Amino acid sequence: MFFERAVREEGASSVPAMRIAVIGAGPSGLATTIALMRRFRRPFEAWLIDAEDAPGAFGDGPAGRALTTEPARDLSVLPDRPDDFAEWLRGSLLAGSTVAALRGPQDMHVPRAVFRDYAMARFGEALSLRRDVRIRTFRGAVRHIGVEEAGLRVCFRDGESAKFDHVVIATGFGIAAREAASWRGAEAAAERLSQQADPPPLTLVGNGPRLAAILLDLRAGGFAGEIHVAAASGRLPQPHGRGHEGMAFGEPPATRSLKDAFRYIRNECSAAEARDGGQWQAVVDAASARLSVVWRNLPQAERNHYRRHLLRLHRHFSIRIARDVHRRLGAEFETGRTRFVPPCDPKTADENTIDCREMPSARALAGLLGRDAATLTVDDCGRLLSHGETLCGLSVVGAIASSLRPGPFTFAETVRQAYRAVLDIAPQGEARVLHR
């Protein structure tokens, strides 16, 4: 039921079509494919590859009922039109709505199914303008990505393989922790426990937006059993605050020390908070923006230190949920039916323990490439580097990139990174295609 457009036959182009693989069919993969169709100015054939889900499946079923973690103003797939999703809501869903008039669509958190419909609409529009493009979808689990003399080979677990000129890895959290598996496991466990006279508690492992959405959906569906939340930090997911627009910062130092970088960020953010009356959310967002700048000067050892000791905490305070969802989650804990318990490893737990964690795995990414995660990093354009050398033909976009660098933690950052990656593909791939 998805799109596939054949390359236009009449007046065949003299420019060979590039073969591009986009691994991951979630929001990051869709944003990347839209960016390709809007900004990549040569014929190409793109494969949207996913181990389990069709493009847009993140909006199906109970996951589609969950609210977006970010407000509409931050969910445009068009970086040159940051209010595009809010305007689409105003024109498509909220025309004449009292809610839209009172509140404005830009501040709304909507069901993910609605965001999916918007993204797919923009996908279709971009595709309709490109007669020199073919889009294919392929369901298969990627086992290995190998660099060959004239391209890259994507090998699947069923033994098949395909060769491409460029590969974009946009798996989100999905290499190690697939969202669909969390929803299915939670639903099955809740149904099983509801049929028992004296059931044990249902344990959800995690403390991010996925945990919040699944927990509240279980309660909305009538599950009345005890729920344990096994979270390393023992904290609820954090709510959104005001943006950090307007905060002014000094020139970042050209430091090669993570300690010096954080001292600069802490001092600048403290001054901005005192001067501008910023909330802690604004300070964290501003700190993330500054860390991305000083990150370029840090040696690999300092980057690895950040990933080992700071990334998990940084992510927890950077990825947030709607204020209403946060309020409902707090009220649920106050009932006593839901409580925090010490963290556990869901891989060694029983069938009533569901993994709801959202932590992209640098180790899983490195495993796909047959490399050591400690040698890898990602630059601002999504280029993947090993030992400081660019791995030609490979880009990493979205949440999976944040396993190797500070961000992107938001969808707007992911979209900007996707467009930078697409603009960077052309010079990388041109020589490879012409010398086939």
Report the location of each language-model feature.
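Flavin (primarily FAD) cofactor-binding/catalytic cores of flavoenzymes
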Residues: F2-D53, V99-K259, R263-R436
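Generic low-complexity, intrinsically disordered sequence content enriched
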Residues: V7, F40, P71-A72, P79-P82, ...
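Rossmann-like AdoMet
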Residues: R38, F58-G61
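N-terminal glycine-rich dinucleotide-binding loop that anchors FAD/FMN and/or NAD(P) in oxidoreductases
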Residues: P62-E87, M247-L258, V325
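A conserved beta-strand/loop capping segment in the N-terminal third of enzymes
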Residues: R81-M108
